[in-house]
Design a protein with these regions (language model features):
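Solvent-exposed, low-complexity segments and loops of surface/extracellular structural proteins
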Residues: 5-6
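Short acidic, S/G/P-rich loop/turn micro-motifs used as interaction or catalytic elements
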Residues: 10-19, 47-51, 74-76, 99
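Well-ordered, non-membrane alpha-helical segments in soluble/globular domains
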Residues: 16-28
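Eukaryotic intrinsically disordered and solvent-exposed regulatory patches
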Residues: 25-30, 53-55
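Eukaryote-biased feature marking scaffold/signaling PDZ-domain proteins and nuclear chromatin regulators
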Residues: 35-38, 63
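Polybasic, proline/glycine-rich intrinsically disordered low-complexity segments
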Residues: 54-106
Length: 106
């Protein structure tokens, strides 16, 4: 199993109200310039938020939800501080409820 860290909020907040796209674009460029594999993803309607251990968090976030998930704890901490009004947490995946950490609902 791998520990994934995340921030989550409504899709509208993460994709329209916060400059998240610019932050992620810059990070992708930095990774490319330094030959680092991408270890973060933005997910719309992420299934991992429905895991039983995140049930309370899932119910607090307006739908549709969005999240940035990563194996890099420092990056998610940075995003949490930068975006401020987001939920955050961590989760071991895959687990008995979810095999694909990047799975999304249609």
């Amino acid at each position: 199993m791998t520990t994934y860290y995340f921030i989550a909020a409504s899709q509208k907040f993460l994709t329209k109200e916060e400059p998240l796209e610019e932050i992620l674009k810059e990070r992708r460029r930095n990774y490319k310039d330094n030959n680092i594999n991408i270890d973060f993803w933005i997910l719309i309607k992420p299934q991992f938020l429905k895991c039983s251990e995140l049930k309370d968090l899932y119910n607090k976030i307006p739908t549709p939800q969005a999240a940035v998930i990563s194996t890099d704890k420092k990056f998610i901490t940075f995003l949490k501080l930068r975006c401020e009004f987001v939920a955050h947490g961590e989760l071991e995946l895959p687990n008995s409820e979810l095999s694909d950490p990047l799975a999304v609902d249609e």
